[in-house]
Each structure stands twice: as C-alpha cells, then as structure tokens.
C-alpha cells in the first residue's frame, strides 16, 4: 500500500553525470495531482485516496462527476485513480490537497510505471512475435513471410487457443518495473526515470513505488 501519482509522458531526453556518462531518461509531468476523495475503513470498508489529474472542460464532465469534484472543492480532472494507503497516512491528508512530486518520491528510488503502449494496427507474426522470415529463393514461392503451419493432425483437428498468429499489435496496458528515478524537478513537478516507458508522448501514465526487488546478479 503505497502512494502513487498520475502523470503525462512528456518525452525522452538525456542527463549527464558528473563523470560524463549519458543517461537516457523519460520525463513525466505529475503536476496537479489533487485529492478528490478520502476513503476510510468506517465509511467505505478500506482506506484509500482518490486522485484527480489534469484538466477537463466543464462540458465534458457528467453531472455526477461534476458534483463529485465540487464536493471536494477541486477542479474537474481527466479521470480518477485510487491508491490504497495506511490509515495513519490518510489521517494527515485532506480533500483538495495537491501532492507534489518530491513528496511522493525521491531521486534514486525504484518505481513501476504503467501506461498504454503505442497501437501499431494489424501486424504479421514477424513484427508481432519476431518470427524468422522464410528463404528468399531456392524453392520458396510466395511464402517468404508466412508463419508456417498452424494446425495439427486430424486429431485434435483444430488450432489450439493462444497460437501465435497475426493480429492487433500494441494499444494494451503495460507496466515497466524497477525503473530508477534519475532526477526530480520539484519546481516544475517533473519526474525523470532512467529508460523508456510505455505509450506515446502526451499519454497518461501511473507511477508507483516498485513492488518487486530484482534478483542480484551472481
């Protein structure tokens, strides 16, 4: 149970260390994370906070959501996300409170970043699953990029579910684990994580403390 933040992927850049090493980083804008609701064990059966992020036109907000935001005294946001926390941490929070980047995370901390990968449309098995191409010649006639046999014999006489075939590639929720925060710009509420994260620039991402500890290399 840890506090996370909702952000927007800005893009990638690089940072230079004091030793001159170049580190590729992804910049995440986590500004305007505000508490829209506080849930407690007594009223909701569990302890959690509900965060709103970004802005949304009043004409694009339903009356139910508009009332929900107005009750907390916060500006309408682009969706809501919940984070379950300990009751002791929730007791220190109030509806409408804005959570800055340096409050939730620190430089050097490992985080998990969840986003929706870039959609690539209908793709073949070579692009989708890295299948090898067929022979370019020597008896190969119009079968250079086909996946090959997909079936069985008369028994069972069907294609098993889960068979790797052509289909839609991308546009799915993915989580990259154990990314290291290289730097936090507290003034502009920017988090810079080492490496790449899912999604296109401008896409919504959720940053949470890492839940798994990577195995040490022997």
From Swiss-Prot:
GO BP, sorted A to Z: translation
Keywords, comma-separated and alphabetical: Methylation, Ribonucleoprotein, Ribosomal protein, RNA-binding, rRNA-binding
Cellular component, GO, one term: cytosolic large ribosomal subunit
Pfam families: Ribosomal_L3
Gene3D superfamilies, A to Z: 3.30.160.810, Translation factors (2.40.30.10)
HAMAP family: Ribosomal_uL3_B
Physiological role: One of the primary rRNA binding proteins, it binds directly near the 3'-end of the 23S rRNA, where it nucleates assembly of the 50S subunit.
Name of the protein in its database record: Large ribosomal subunit protein uL3
Organism taxonomic ancestry: Bacteria, Pseudomonadati, Pseudomonadota, Betaproteobacteria, Burkholderiales
């Amino acid at each position: 149970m840890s506090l996370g933040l909702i952000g927007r992927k800005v893009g990638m850049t690089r940072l230079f260390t004091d030793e001159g090493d170049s580190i590729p980083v992804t910049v995440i804008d986590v500004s305007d994370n505000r508490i829209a609701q506080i849930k407690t064990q007594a009223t909701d059966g569990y302890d959690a906070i509900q965060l709103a992020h970004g802005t949304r036109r009043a004409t694009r907000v339903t009356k139910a959501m508009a009332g929900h935001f107005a009750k907390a005294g916060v500006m309408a946001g682009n969706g809501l996300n919940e984070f379950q926390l300990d009751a002791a941490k929730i007791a220190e929070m109030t509806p409408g409170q804005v959570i800055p980047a340096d409050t939730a995370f620190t430089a050097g901390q490992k985080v998990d970043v969840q986003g929706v990968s870039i959609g690539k449309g209908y793709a073949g098995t070579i692009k989708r699953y890295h299948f090898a191409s067929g022979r370019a010649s020597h008896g190969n006639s119009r079968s250079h990029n086909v996946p090959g046999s997909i079936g069985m014999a008369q028994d069972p006489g069907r294609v098993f579910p889960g068979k790797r075939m052509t289909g839609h590639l991308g546009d799915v929720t993915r989580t990259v684990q154990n990314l290291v925060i290289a730097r936090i710009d507290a003034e502009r509420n920017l988090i810079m994580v080492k490496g790449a994260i899912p999604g296109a620039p401008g896409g919504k991402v959720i940053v949470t403390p890492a839940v798994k500890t990577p195995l040490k290399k022997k």
